[in-house]
Amino acid sequence: MSCTWPNGASSFGTGWLFGPNDVATAAHVVYSQENGGYPSSIIFYPGVNNSGSIVGASYKATIAVLPATYQSERDDTKDYAFLSLNSNIGNTLGYLGWATSVSVGNTMALTGYAGEHAYELWEGIGQIKSTSGSFLRYTADSSRGMSGGAIYLTIQMKAAGFNHGGYPGESYNYGVKINSSIANEMNYYKNKN
């Protein structure tokens, strides 16, 4: 997923389909006070090969949900966003379900387009180390560009959260956990379109 910002900067991150035209990602992928707030354009690519060629088509995305407290306070407990695509590609490609029940020790994985390996899909596999509060902490490797990717449980093959990155003062990575409130929002937007 690539963003072009009002100040002319560009960036990329990872998102994942959770409905026919619904994409989940991290809020910090699609909102940046430093770059002018909201992106002037967001393009979603279902896949990119290692030569930089887009696999399939690209799709225009618009922000459907971005928590207000993330915008005003950079509240990391609200570091998630939902986007709407201009096509129901999930009906063809499929999409991830999600889970609100996660246990310490569950095997999990992250996939995304790591910044130092541009145009290559990378996966990190690890274990859930903590489920307390609003976050999941885990041992899977993450890198710039993988932000917004699903924290998915490998046995259930369901998303349990949104990858953020390194946890301050720890060797673990972390992301926002899909709790019942976020799951309700996801159900609402998935069924709205």
Residue ranges of predicted features:
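Short, mixed charged/polar active-site loops
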Residues: 9-12, 54, 119-123, 157
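Catalytic nucleophile loop of clan PA
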Residues: 141-163
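Catalytic histidine site
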Residues: 1-43, 128-131, 153, 175-176
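C-terminal cap/linker of serine protease catalytic domains
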Residues: 160, 164-193
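Active-site-proximal beta-strand/loop segments in catalytic clefts of secreted hydrolases
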Residues: 2-4, 18-20, 26-29, 45-48, ...
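Chymotrypsin/trypsin-fold serine protease catalytic domain
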Residues: 50, 61, 76-146, 171-179
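Conserved catalytic-core segment of clan PA serine endopeptidases
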Residues: 3-8, 12, 31, 37-90
